[in-house]
Amino acid sequence: MAELKNDRYLRALLKQPVDMTPVWMMRQAGRYLPEYKATRAQAGDFMSLCKNHELACEVTLQPLRRYELDAAILFSDILTVPDAMGLGLYFEAGEGPRFERPTDTIDAIKKLSIPDPEDELGYVMKAVSTIRRELNGAVPLIGFSGSPWTLATYMVEGGSSKTFEKIKKMAYAEPAALHMLLDKLADSVILYLNAQVANGAQSLMIFDSWGGALSHTAYREFSLRYMQKIVDGLTRFADGRQVPVTLFTKGGGLWLEAMAETGCDALGLDWTVDIADARRRVGHKVALQGNMDPSMLYAPIPRIEEEVSQILAGYGEGTGHVFNLGHGIHQHVDPEHAGAFIKAVHAQSKQYHK
């Protein structure tokens, strides 16, 4: 494998000195870019794009051609794992992801098998190895998965949900059934992420998009417990260097201390968290990623630059901060505004790394 030319992102996650704060954007390969829309049209639909390793590689690299980003993230979807378990993933216009066969009974959960990442998810591994080769050491490649709780919400609800009624009913009325599902998902995610590392991923991220829907105690029981199991089972060293792991619970600002206890290297912060407060609470244990409100990219460029300045000042001096948005970039953002955001992070952060 080619030697890394820019390892700023990996170094910041491991709290090693950097010359400036690294930056990337969640969903940086996405619908705000005209070139992404063209490639997606060529693929036919979203899942066909995910399953074609050459096109998945192309869209992963597109934002890196435009911007001086410090990391690439695999173009895929968190629902590849449940899809590989045989649930029949499809996308309904205006409705988002749906499953033909939800796992809303104990019998359905018992029948689930753990997918082989090199077989049922082989298309993802082919994308990882292709992207890693094409990056040629320019920046590190991030692999990722959804958290067991977040994947389970889609599997039990049969798709997206605003209320999480079915899965919460299972959590409180049939907890043994939900624990069985979460355990299978944790085992599946461990295999899936370790296979991504074996195929070239240099950092890992676990997206717990819906952990914030849980109560204080339920979060620990149904979400954090299974992310802990995953962290314990991950390959943390490959290609002669550490493979950092980042946990991100959207709406998880209450639980940063508990998340930092898992042994992960970094925590993702959404935009509701004060980064200065987060650093005071857990900065001695973990690096922090975040956390500008993605909607700020709709603001005039001087306002974006001002927000970047405030977040950098909030984190303060020294390493251990990866700048990002607090969630994925919105599809209607002007690509020039995204570019101004990235430039502002690099230009303004040098003063904090003397």
Swiss-Prot record:
Stretches assigned to coiled coil: none
EC number: 4.1.1.37
Pathway involvement of the protein, from the record: Porphyrin-containing compound metabolism; protoporphyrin-IX biosynthesis; coproporphyrinogen-III from 5-aminolevulinate: step 4/4
GO annotation terms (biological process): protoporphyrinogen IX biosynthetic process from glutamate
A Gene Ontology term for the protein's cellular component: cytosol
UniProt superkingdom: Bacteria
Residues involved in substrate binding: 27-31, 77, 154, 209, 327
Gene Ontology molecular function terms on file: uroporphyrinogen decarboxylase activity
Alphabetical list of Pfam families matching this protein: URO-D
Keywords: Cytoplasm, Decarboxylase, Lyase, Porphyrin biosynthesis
Compartment(s): Cytoplasm
Protein's job: Catalyzes the decarboxylation of four acetate groups of uroporphyrinogen-III to yield coproporphyrinogen-III.
HAMAP family: URO_D (MF_00218)
Family: Belongs to the uroporphyrinogen decarboxylase family.
Quaternary structure annotation from Swiss-Prot or TrEMBL: Homodimer.
NCBIfam families (alphabetical): hemE (TIGR01464)
The protein's name in its UniProt record: Uroporphyrinogen decarboxylase
Record lineage: Bacteria, Pseudomonadati, Pseudomonadota, Gammaproteobacteria, Alteromonadales
